[in-house]
Amino acid sequence: MTLNIRIIAPDRTVWDAEAQEIILPSSTGQLGILTGHAPLLTALDIGVMRVRVDKEWMPIVLLGGFAEIENNQLTILVNGAEEASQIDLVEAEKNLDTATQLLNDASSSKEKIEATQNIRKARARVQAATAASA
């Protein structure tokens, strides 16, 4: 059996295919989903989702959202998503360095919050690109 997975971002459908297993970055930690999973609605955090198709794992960066599983149908609504194969690792590492420097230079609470979010996004991109190139 397989899971039918649909990942929808505001601007496009990111993924619409079947897979054997999913690992989601939920707001309470990593969440593994296999066929026959109990119905569930969960909030997603910024992080790397891993999709297993046959014996290959594919990382996808998620920028927060929600996931619903019911009857082997997994619907994921996200604020944004990026497939690891489209991420340039060198650029992602530069973005992480820049975001870290912005956090160090931040003086207001708002700047610190924005910089922290940018670091989380950049870190997820680096993790996904590294996993894809391994």
From Swiss-Prot:
Protein function: Produces ATP from ADP in the presence of a proton gradient across the membrane.
HAMAP family: ATP_synth_epsil_bac
Keyword 4Fe-4S tagged: no
Main location: plastid
InterPro entries for this protein: ATP_synth_F1_dsu/esu, ATP_synth_F1_dsu/esu_N, ATP_synth_F1_esu_C, ATPsynth_dsu/esu_N
Topological relation to the membrane, as annotated: Peripheral membrane protein
SUPFAM superfamilies from the UniProt entry: Epsilon subunit of F1F0-ATP synthase N-terminal domain
Assembly, per entry: F-type ATPases have 2 components, CF(1) - the catalytic core - and CF(0) - the membrane proton channel. CF(1) has five subunits: alpha(3), beta(3), gamma(1), delta(1), epsilon(1). CF(0) has three main subunits: a, b and c.
Pfam families membership: ATP-synt_DE, ATP-synt_DE_N
Any Gene Ontology CC annotation: proton-transporting ATP synthase complex
Presence of keyword Membrane: yes
GO molecular function: ATP binding; proton-transporting ATP synthase activity, rotational mechanism
Signal peptide: none
Name of the featured protein: ATP synthase epsilon chain, chloroplastic
Location relative to the cell: Plastid, Chloroplast thylakoid membrane
CDD domains: F1-ATPase_delta
UniProt gene name: atpE
Highest rank taxon of the organism: Eukaryota
